[in-house]
Amino acid sequence: DNIPWFISENGMGVEGEERFINSEGYIEDDYRIEFFEEHLSYLHKAIKEGANCFGYHSWTPIDCWSWTNAYKNRYGFIAVDLKTQKKTMKKSGKWIKEVSKNNGF
């Protein structure tokens, strides 16, 4: 049987992401883009080969608190300044927006 399934949580946490802030004030997280691009490419291949996957969810769209390391690692497509609560789209957020808009790479 080809059981329907979905990926409920996929993502990566990075410590010290503020070191990747560029002169325009947003985080250039190419490592996260590469991570998601690779995972989505393999998922696409699996679907083409008959996998019955009907959904894919990233871990979180916004930097969040983790039971394991609080706010030490950052996970989202949107950065959160913990002092001001200002939210800033990361490079990966701009990338995933385009992937979603175009329904693929």
Predicted ranges, named:
Residues D1-F105:
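Non-catalytic scaffold segments within catalytic domains of secreted glycoside hydrolases
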